[in-house]
Swiss-Prot record:
Quaternary structure (record): Homodimer. Heterotetramer of two MnmE and two MnmG subunits.
Keywords: Cytoplasm, GTP-binding, Hydrolase, Magnesium, Metal-binding, Nucleotide-binding, Potassium, tRNA processing
Name of the featured protein: tRNA modification GTPase MnmE
One Gene Ontology term from the biological process aspect of the record: tRNA methylation
Pfam families: MMR_HSR1, MnmE_helical, TrmE_N
Domain TrmE-type G: 214-375
Binding residues for (6S)-5-formyl-5,6,7,8-tetrahydrofolate: R21, E78, K118, K452
GO molecular function: GTP binding; GTPase activity; metal ion binding
Matching InterPro entries: G_TrmE, GTP-bd, GTP-bd_TrmE_N, GTPase_MnmE, MnmE_dom2, MnmE_helical, P-loop_NTPase, Small_GTP-bd
Organism field: Haemophilus influenzae (strain PittGG)
Top-level lineage group: Bacteria
Primary residence: cytoplasm
């Protein structure tokens, strides 16, 4: 028999309204015990909520949803009372006294809904993402995921892969046919079409991941290059202390900002040099740790100092020490001191922006550059949020499609192509939960609120 669970569905603490949710086959029994009757399905009823001895604990609205026409797909009872935590705790305690009722685990209501096919795994995750959204665009994209925008794209890919698998396996099972299916070009054309289709979804998912998680951008450079001034300019407030004394910043400073809905984690670090002071050395060590973990580096140069902007020295002192895959944007700061105009250019393979963090001249250029560098498009229609596990699954699917293409075009190996397509289907299906381990489900739903 399925279990019946209960939890507070509203946030803990004081509020105008507090809601308890009961889900499972004993929901009607809870209604009889607390309300003296079970409300008609989907009809609000204003009733007293009673303790075991008949004492009225609260009064409010009771709603009953009969399976399968509920959020979880089970019988659901919602008690909407006053939002005092003491009152809600008393009512919750009373419900838990009823045999067969237990407190819900975090995310268990959503887990019930997923297991009852009310939505798929990507949609379930979108519930948590909608709650946690930190910007209007992130909230809109989470809602699109909840409505199935992401799942629809993934399911279309899965359908295309299944169709191609069927065609490939037919060519293997019927080798005596006069037509060589592997060589007639149709399979290769379909395979390349799926690869292109997947690339479009990956690009959109990458933007969705940016919206959800943000990008970590570290500002680095020599002391007194204007790193803290740039942090303040991007943050729009005096987040960091700025002086003419080199080495003022000795620890890591973090600011969370939004650029047209794109979340950025901006990190100001200690100036990089050979320090003799122990505290400054610790700060520089922490700076390098942040640099190694960054998604992008903003390398600050002092344009008023000819030695500072010598790219050959910059390359040996700094750029050569970075991971080769780490993207770098070079910023020539302090153009207000030499009369330069704000500009954007490319030098030696690096994007370079000339600006003044002091006067903010050119800061807008940097903001636009960061948006473009992250692959972010303002106001993108049909966007959805994506998690790291979604990107990983899409990346693995893309990798096996490319392997399959090689097996087809270079080795004419139908059996190996069929196996690669099977793996692609498996990775894509992990996103929506069609093929998902119990451990993964546990990790996902345990991150939800208790009442979700």
């Amino acid at each position: 028999m399925k279990e019946t669970i209960v939890a507070q569905a509203t946030a803990p603490g004081r509020g105008g309204i507090g809601i308890l949710r009961v889900s499972g086959p004993l929901a009607t029994e809870v209604a009889q015990a607390i309300l003296g009757k079970c409300p008609k399905p989907r009809m609000a009823d204003y009733l007293p909520f009673k303790d075991a001895d008949g004492t009225i604990l609260d009064q409010g609205i009771a709603l009953y949803f009969k399976s399968p026409n509920s959020f979880t797909g089970e019988d659901v009872l919602e008690l909407q009372g006053h939002g005092g935590q003491v009152v809600l705790d008393l009512l919750l305690k009373r419900i838990l006294q009823i045999d067969g009722i237990r407190l819900a685990r975090p995310g268990e209501f959503s887990e019930q809904a997923f297991l009852n096919d009310k939505f798929d795994l990507a949609q379930a995750e979108a519930i948590a993402d909608l709650i946690d959204a930190t910007s209007e665009q992130a909230a809109r994209s989470a809602l699109k995921s909840l409505q199935g925008e992401f799942s629809k794209k993934v399911n279309e890919l899965v359908d295309s892969v299944i169709y191609l698998r069927t065609y490939v396996e037919a060519s293997i099972d019927f080798p005596d046919e006069e037509i060589d299916f592997l060589a007639d070009g149709k399979i290769e054309a379909n395979l390349r079409s799926i690869i292109n289709q997947l690339e479009d979804v990956r690009a959109e998912a990458k933007q969705g991941s940016i919206l959800r998680e943000g990008m970590k951008v570290v500002i680095a450079g020599r002391p007194n290059a204007g790193k803290s001034s740039l942090l303040n300019a991007l943050a729009g407030r005096e987040a960091a202390i700025v002086t003419d004394i080199a080495g003022t910043t000795r620890d890591v400073l973090r600011e969370h900002i939004h650029i047209d809905g794109m979340p950025l984690h901006i990190i100001d670090t200690a100036g990089l040099r050979d320090a003799t002071d122990e505290v400054e050395r610790i700060g520089i060590s922490r700076a390098w740790t942040e640099i190694e973990q960054a998604d992008r580096i903003i390398l600050m140069l002092d344009s008023s100092d000819p030695e500072s902007v010598d790219l050959s020295k910059v390359r040996s002192e700094f750029l050569a020490k970075l991971p080769s895959t780490l993207p770098v944007t070079i910023v020539r700061n302090k153009i207000d001191l030499n009369g330069e105009q704000a500009s954007e250019s490319e030098q030696s393979g690096y994007q370079m922006i000339s600006l003044s963090a002091q006067t903010h001249d050119g800061v807008k250029l940097l903001r636009e550059h960061l948006k473009q560098a992250m692959g972010f498009q303002t106001g993108m229609e049909g966007g959805f949020l994506a998690r790291r596990r979604h990107l990983d699954a899409l990346d693995k699917a893309a990798e096996h499609l490319q392997i399959g293409l090689v097996q087809l075009t270079e080795f004419h190996a139908g059996e190996l192509l069929a196996e690669e397509l099977r793996l692609v289907q498996s990775y894509l299906s992990e996103i929506t939960g069609q093929f998902t381990s119990d451990d993964l489900l546990g990790n996902i739903f345990s991150s939800f609120c208790i009442g979700k």
